[in-house]
Amino acid sequence: MLLLRSALTRALASRTLAPQVCSSFATGPRQYDGIFYEFRSYYLKPSKMNEFLENFKKNAHLRTAHSELVGYWSVEFGGRMNTVFHIWKYDNFAHRTEVRKALAKDKEWQEQFLIPNLALIDKQESEITYLVPWCKLEKPPKEGVYELATFQMKPGGPALWGDAFKRAVHAHVNLGYTKLVGVFHTEYGALNRVHVLWWNESADSRAAGRHKSHEDPRVVAAVRESVNYLVSQQNMLLIPTSFSPLK
């Protein structure tokens, strides 16, 4: 009886020990660092796209005096037309709050750009994202085009799908046909969403590289593993504006 009770106790104890799951996406470095990136999408009235961009170009210095602009693009393929997409960097949430308060008090910004241009915008969207710990923001070597690939992953978080996703990204990087700019994990917005920002010399070089990658067994194997955790995905071709820091 004692032996049976002892064996049962050990069995129950082993079942209560939760397995430790580690992931290279896991929360930690990105939260400790505090730095995050705000993704903003402005859907503009079709007849007002050029006017809006010209107005921002003339007044961009008023906005960038308050916080860092990472990049500013127009959507060419894969998304709603007449859309501009931009990324802003903040040290932490307190920093963003300070910036928003300062902008609200900046009469020059309000009067020269914001108020006159609000009527040109149909809709605005915002997401807060962190760079994943294994990726730092990279600047491309020259001007080109950008691809924003967005992946909606299954619930469970990076501990479930992070490592497989990392291997899939690196499989493409290792082929050398494209340059990885950054991998971002959404904190506010749709959860379990990952954005991968790529740079290519042109849309045609990107197409040729993708064709090559689809025939590479290393890429095929890594992607096949990652899609087990995928719900949906979308990609957009982005054209940098003349005033975008990332060209």
Swiss-Prot record:
Name the keywords, alphabetized.
Acetylation, Cytoplasm
| SUPFAM superfamilies referenced in this protein's UniProt entry, alphabetically | Dimeric alpha+beta barrel
Entry similarity comment: Belongs to the NipSnap family.
Q: What is its main location?
A: cytoplasm
Q: Quick one: a GO cellular component term?
A: mitochondrion
InterPro entries recorded: Dimeric_a/b-barrel, NIPSNAP, NipSnap_domain
Q: Please provide the Gene Ontology terms (biological process) for this protein.
A: mitophagy
Where does it reside?
Cytoplasm, Cytosol
Modification N6-acetyllysine occurs at: K48, K166
The protein's name in its UniProt record: Protein NipSnap homolog 3A
